[in-house]
Amino acid sequence: VLSPADKTNVKTTWDKIGGHAGEYGGEALERTFMAFPTTKTYFPHFDLSPGSAQVKTHGKKVADALTTAVSHIDDLPGALSALSDLHAYKLRVDPVNFKLLSHCLLVTLACHHPADFTPAVHASLDKFFSAVSTVLTSKYR
């Protein structure tokens, strides 16, 4: 459960990311593919080479979904319902992949904003990404 302090940390951090969210989303997705090669199986039609336009485009979609989640932090299930349906029923993404991507998002954000990435912010973002992952996998059951 996200505390009021967690919500503030997430919103403040996301505001600082600003227009770089899409760039960071692409970088995190690329990092996920490199660190966890099994995640590539969901993208057989993509050029997965470093700097790929397809990976960057999908990374922006991930970032846009997270921006929506931040904007609706008090109603993640409502905000992400359609995305949950897509991943559960159509794409059938293994739930563990959300955790792997979340980890790579944390690493990417820490690399770009080391001064802002305090232990409290790290914990808040980790809890937020976990909450988003829980919503995205809620319809698997």
Swiss-Prot record:
Q: Where along the chain is heme b bound? A: H87
One Gene Ontology MF term: oxygen binding
Quaternary form? Heterotetramer of two alpha chains and two beta chains.
Its keywords, alphabetically, are: Acetylation, Heme, Iron, Metal-binding, Oxygen transport, Phosphoprotein, Transport
Recorded hits in Pfam families, A to Z, give:
Globin
Which residue positions does Phosphothreonine occur at? T8, T108, T134, T137
Q: What is this protein called?
A: Hemoglobin subunit alpha-1/2
UniProt keyword Phosphoprotein, yes or no: yes
Q: Which GO terms describe its biological process?
A: hydrogen peroxide catabolic process
Entry-annotated residues carrying Phosphoserine: S3, S49, S102, S124, S138
Q: Which residues carry this modification: N6-succinyllysine?
A: K7, K11, K16, K40
**Residues bearing PTM N6-acetyllysine:** K16
Q: What is the lineage of its organism?
A: Eukaryota, Metazoa, Chordata, Craniata, Vertebrata
Question: Which family does this protein fall into?
Answer: Belongs to the globin family.
Functionally, this protein is described as follows: Involved in oxygen transport from the lung to the various peripheral tissues.
Residues annotated as binding O2 are H58
Phosphotyrosine occurs at which residues? Y24
Instruction: Report, as the record phrases it, the tissue specificity of this protein.
Output: Red blood cells.
- Please list the residue ranges annotated as the Globin domain: 1-141
Question: By its UniProt entry, which CDD domains does this protein fall under?
Answer: Hb-alpha-like
Q: Which GO terms describe its cellular component?
A: blood microparticle; haptoglobin-hemoglobin complex; hemoglobin complex
